[in-house]
C-alpha cells in the first residue's frame, strides 16, 4: 500500500486511466489521418457518367479493378465537370457483376491512348489489422473503464489489495485531550503509544509489546474517537479500515486484503492498524446464515493467523472496536491476539461534566448555565448523547433568534434527545387531556410514595416523540446496581397509570400497553436472571447472550423444562399483581394529592421537580416491605455493622433508578407502540399505546 502520487488537489492520480486515454487519442488520430491521406486522389462518379466518358474521346488511361470492390479508374485528358463541381482528371466509378462484361467491352472500345490494365483489389495490412482489431480494442477499453469505476478508479485488478487508509498527518488532529469521560481507556492507550515510541524501556524489563487492543462498549461511548486520538498522538503510520471492507462478493478477496494490510504495516513498523466494527468479520465461526465455510470465516481465519504470526518485537499493534463483543470468535479474544480488552462504558458524573465542557467550547453559554446540573440530569447518557444535547441546544437557540444558549434551551435539548421532539401540531380533546393527566399523575404519585424510588423530576402532558405525555424519574447520583426492593418499586409505579384508569375511570384503554410490556420485562428478568424469586430459586434460566445472534441460537433447545417455564410465568404474574396492588393502594390513600397534581397539570401542562416536591409534601408513604429471604429455612442476620451506615431493608435508597450492571434489563425507548387494534387511535394518546421507560438513559420515564 505504497502512497500513490497525488494531484495538487490531493486526489490520487490514475496512471492506467492516463495510458488508456493516450491510446484512444492515438487511435482516433490514426483513423483521421487514414481518412484524410489514405485516398489516392480519384473522385467518385456515377456508373452512367463513367460509361459516357468511355464512349467519348477524353479517356487517356483506364484501370479495371476486381476483387472485394469492382470499379474502373480513369485518367482523363481534361477536367470532368459534374454540374458546377469540378471532379478533375482522375475519376472512378463502380459497377456490379451484371455489368461486368459491358464495362470491359466499353474499356476495350474506348482504346485509351496509354492503354488499360486489370488489377485485383487488396487492402493494406495495417488497415486490415485496424479494422479487425478495432472492435476488440473498443470492447476491452469499455470493460477496463467499467472495472476502474467499480473499484474506485486506478485499481482495476487490485481486488485483493487492502482498502485501509493511512492517517494524514496534515489533517486536523484529535488528541487525548479531546477525549473525556474515559480516563482508564486513555491511560491504557497512552501506554500503547509509549510502547511504540520507546520499546526499549519495556523490553529492558522483559515486557512484550501487546499484539492487540479491543475497545468494546455501547454505541456512542467514544471507541472510534479514542482510535482517532491514538492516530493523532502516535508519530507512527496509522492504518484505519472498517471490518466490512474486508468482505466482498469475490471469494478470497477478504483474506488477501488481510495479508496485504498486515504486510504493509510490517514493512512500515512501528505501526498501528485500526479495524472499526470488527464484529462484521470477526463473529463466531460456525454460526450465522452463511454456514461454516463462507468468505467471512476465511477472512477471519487469515486474520487469526496474521495476529498470531507477529514476531516478538514486530512493533505492530492492532486496535479494534465493537459494540457486540459477545458474538466475537473466542479464538480472536484469547491472549496473544487481543492481549488487552478495554471496556468503554457510559461516563459517570465527572466524565459527563468533562464531556460537556469539551463540547461546550465555542458555544456562547449564559452566565447562569450550570453544566454540572446538566450532567446530573443526564445520567446514563453516552458521550454522543451529550454532544447531541449541546448541539440541539445551539440549534434551538439559533432557531429562536437568540445569541446565547440558556437553561431553557438546554432543558428542551435534554428532552429532545431523551424523548424526541415535541409535537406542537397534535390536538387532544379535553377528555384525552384529562385521561393523560390522571395517567401520568398516577405514575408520579406512586413513584413519590415508594420508599426506594428515585425522585420524580418532571411530569408533562405535552406530546413528545411517540408519547402523549411522560413522567421522568431520575436518580440523583450514579448507581452500579439495584436492589430487589428498588426493582419492585419500579414495577409499582409502572403500574400506576393502569391502576388510575381502572380505579377512577372504571375502564382501561390501550394506552398502558407499553407499561405492561416494560413491567413484564423487568419482572421476567428478576425471575430468570437475578434469582429474586423464592419459588423459581437462585438460577439463571436465560442464555449467556442478552441479544440474539441469528444462527447461533438456531437449533438450540430451551435450557429449562416446560414445567419451569410455566412456573416462571406464574411468578412473573404474581410480581405484577403485587405491583398493581401496591399502586392501587397508593392511589386510594392519596386521592386528594392525585387530584391536586392533575389540576396543576391541566393548568400548566408541565411540572418541574420543585413544583412536584411542593405537591407531594402530603403524600402518605407506603410501609416498608417485609424482609425478603429466598427460603424461610435460612435465618436472617443483623444489618451490617462494618463499613458504613445502612438503613433497614425496605428503605435502602432514595436514589434508585440506575440500570443494573453489568447486565441490566434492557428497557424499550419511552413511548413504545401499543397493540394494533382496528379502529383504535395510536401514538400515545388515550386509546393508543405509548407508556414507556427510558432505561437506556438511566432514567425511568413513563410516557402516555
Curated annotation (Swiss-Prot):
The keyword DNA-binding does not apply. ATP binds at residues 217-224. One of its GO terms (cellular component) is plasma membrane. It is an enzyme of class 3 (hydrolase). Residues 39-127 are extracellular. The active site is at 440. Acts as a processive, ATP-dependent zinc metallopeptidase for both cytoplasmic and membrane proteins. Plays a role in the quality control of integral membrane proteins. This is ATP-dependent zinc metalloprotease FtsH. It comes from Brachybacterium faecium (strain ATCC 43885 / DSM 4810 / JCM 11609 / LMG 19847 / NBRC 14762 / NCIMB 9860 / 6-10). The lineage of its organism: Bacteria, Bacillati, Actinomycetota, Actinomycetes, Micrococcales. The gene is ftsH.
